Amino acid sequence: MLTVVDGEIVEEYDEFINIGQALSPKIISLTGITNEMLAEEGRSEETVAIDLKKKLTEDTIMIAHNAQFDLSFIYFLLKRHYPDEAEDIVGNIQWLDTLTVLKDRMDYPHKLVDAVEHYGVEKVNFHRAIDDTKALYSVTQELKLERDDLEEYINIFGYNPKYGVGKFRFPFITYKPQYYHNRGKLPPNEILPKK
């Protein structure tokens, strides 16, 4: 997680959560994170939940690629430690889903790696959270330069009607079917209907 003030990165939050289980060889290969790293640097889930509760304040705009995943992950982590507060914590901040924005602006595929390539952003190591976060911040800056309408996407998550939203919907997010026609040609208020 990056804290950005006036366009400048002022803090990086990058923590491993040690859940007390060994990582699979696939995860180790994909991320480069080892069991030894978790043993030495990993923090408890409770400690990370405490940190997130402090960091996710009402003036937070959480930018994520496929934000439904990140929102669900953070919500359920917080719910295990703050069962009565979790929904308020994640519901009091604003969410910007860059996957929704990219589906309006560029042709398929829409993975973060594709956005990085499309916008010419430098990326060090995919599948490491802090590197993905820095790349996503750079992509978001490019999206803003391309068309200054990102505010219209706040708390709107697009989804493919063929597959639906999934099992869990958050009441503070507006879910809109997002079709693939007219990418890049119409502003979001015409592609994604207003809340």
Per-segment meaning from a language model:
Residues 1-89, 110-127:
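Conserved non-catalytic scaffold segment of RNase H-like nuclease domains
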Residues 70, 97, 132:
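Acidic active-site catalytic centers that drive phospho-/nucleotidyl reactions
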Residues 74, 101, 136-140:
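Buried hydrophobic packing segments
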Residues 78-79, 106, 141-145:
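Hydrophobic/aromatic-lined pockets within catalytic cores
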Residues 93-108:
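Short alpha-helix plus adjacent loop in nuclease-associated cores
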Residues 123-127, 131, 155, 176:
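Cysteine endopeptidase catalytic domains of the caspase/legumain-like
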Residues 128-142:
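Acidic, divalent-metal-coordinating active-site segment for phosphoryl/phosphodiester hydrolysis
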Residues 139-195:
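Acidic two-metal-ion nuclease catalytic site recognized across multiple nuclease folds
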